[in-house]
Amino acid sequence: MEWFEALILGVLQGLTEYLPVSSSGHLAIGSALFGIQGEDNLTFTIAVHVATVLSTLVILWKEIGWIFRGLFKFEMNAETKYVINILVSMIPIGIVGVFFKDYVEEIFGSGLLIVGCMLLLTALLLAFSYYAKPRLKENISMKDAFIIGLAQACAVMPGLSRSGTTIATGLLLGDNKAKLAQFSFLMVIPPILGEALLDGMKIVKGAAAGTSDISVLSLVVGFLAAFISGCVACKWMINIVKKGKLIYFAIYCAIAGAVTIACTLM
């Protein structure tokens, strides 16, 4: 992987991790265009995912600080309930990671046709949430957190946007727009770090076998590109959800999905 390829893919990851257009789908398309695969692709994916987690921590540091201050009061307050909701939302993705990880990895290697189909499904979800009748829930309930977690578990499919799926699900449930976007970005931090740890163990084994030769420069460039673009996209996406402008991303996903399918079948 050349440094300029890492730059492009890093920016792509940073933007699409938060914008509801599927980071996994766009990374798969970008990697296919650049001919990047195997251990190099896995190493780079870990680096840019960790970068976007860091960008979440930077943009939402006030909310994270609020959570930890409340936790250390050691009482059942709003902050403790928030953490419980995040833990509840992790149950479905945890089950998928433990029992279906190999199956999911097979799907990721099945080509771009599935990516195109899932992009179309993302478009439908965003469109449904846009036209859904708005309801006013002040806080995300434990039940809603679990349902949103189910949506996140489904979004392991390449091309099905995690942020788009979770936010659209929350909107259909009638949750508060601003709080929903923040919850969606915070709930994914533990699963991403857990997956990065597991994949990192694979990289260590691969390095011992000499199966990865991606340069340090490419990793650093990709990491910084993903972090900076992720900071911009995270803040932007929160404002987009507040203003209810997801329909534009539904149109984009529909076009991107259709083009991907057409190119795959040609």
From Swiss-Prot:
Q: Which family does it belong to?
A: Belongs to the UppP family.
Q: Which domain of life is it from?
A: Bacteria
Q: What is this protein called?
A: Undecaprenyl-diphosphatase
Question: What's the protein's topology in the membrane?
Answer: Multi-pass membrane protein
Q: What is its EC number?
A: 3.6.1.27
Gene that encodes the chain: uppP
Q: What functional role does this protein have?
A: Catalyzes the dephosphorylation of undecaprenyl diphosphate (UPP). Confers resistance to bacitracin.
Q: Which reaction does it catalyse?
A: di-trans,octa-cis-undecaprenyl diphosphate + H2O = di-trans,octa-cis-undecaprenyl phosphate + phosphate + H(+)
> Looking at its record, which EC class is this enzyme?
hydrolase
Q: What organism does the record attribute this protein to?
A: Phocaeicola vulgatus (strain ATCC 8482 / DSM 1447 / JCM 5826 / CCUG 4940 / NBRC 14291 / NCTC 11154)
* GO annotation, cellular component aspect: plasma membrane
Query: Keyword Acyltransferase, does the record have it?
Result: no
